[in-house]
């Protein structure tokens, strides 16, 4: 079973990603992880932190000479701003005099839309700092690090690549054209908003500029595409084994994500059954389809079509023109605390959604095919693909 977790706070010394259950022999380097972390910092509308934030990647365990060893993998991402926060975020007790600085003032005015309020009440904190430090989307950098290993496994074992693009930002008209292919990823990353379509890009930029002028923030929708998946990852046998339920849970677990859909998702509910599904036809190598409304999943299993997962991100909760709240110490009306933030982080969210999709797909592949090494997993995959090909119905010549 592939398992992952992260540790660390937004302004702590470092973030740490742990990945357990990865087979031996998967090629991975610190440079590859750094490249994915750089993609996470992309996007028009990001705040000042992205300009000076540097992700210092250190492989702590589980990798030797560029290959995974089969044991737990630990990856550290250092915080270049740690010296500014060393007293405030020190794990050990510090002299109270050292804490007499502005950035350590108690944060008692929770931000609507954030974890501050519920976290303070649940854990008994009189300050939102312990909540916001862990709840921060900075934590996703560690997920991206772990997900880079999963991406490498999918590429080497199955020839599968995962990409994302932004569908819409704010009220911009959603892109509704064909899904991009992996060969389009470089052009997508070159777009200021990671859009596949130039006309959509211009509308998104206009939305961000308007929000910036108004002292506001924006959310949006991203789509992740994974092509080349074999038929049969996941299962129909129980809800927890359905791949769509696993994908939805993983993506919904990303900070600020408020909705997930597979394929055409909610739009499918508006259609009649006769035009909602992907009809099948005999082809030279088995079943073929002319549509992919299901997004590559039927009955909780991959069906050989490209996987399409969309995620809706809410507007960033830290609004420059602070929202109304209540001071948790005095009980009086107040305006929410304002931490340094972005106007829009939707382009970066796409990279994080890619990460979670890659981790779930890698787990599903390892559950299906097993193996202790990449070579063994590949052999198991080849055997399965041969068996599936034999079961495919042969196309009949029309009379």
UniProtKB/Swiss-Prot annotation:
Its EC number is 4.2.3.5. FMN binds at residues 134-136, 255-256, 299, 314-318, 340. The keyword Lyase applies. GO terms for biological process: amino acid biosynthetic process; aromatic amino acid family biosynthetic process; chorismate biosynthetic process. Its cofactor is FMNH2. Keywords: Amino-acid biosynthesis, Aromatic amino acid biosynthesis, FAD, Flavoprotein, FMN, Lyase, NADP. Reduced FMN (FMNH(2)). NADP(+) binds at residues 40, 46. It comes from the Bacteria. The keyword rRNA-binding does not apply. Gene3D superfamilies: Chorismate synthase AroC. This reaction introduces a second double bond into the aromatic ring system. HAMAP family: Chorismate_synth. Homotetramer. Belongs to the chorismate synthase family. This is Chorismate synthase. It comes from Mycolicibacterium smegmatis (strain ATCC 700084 / mc(2)155). The gene is aroC.
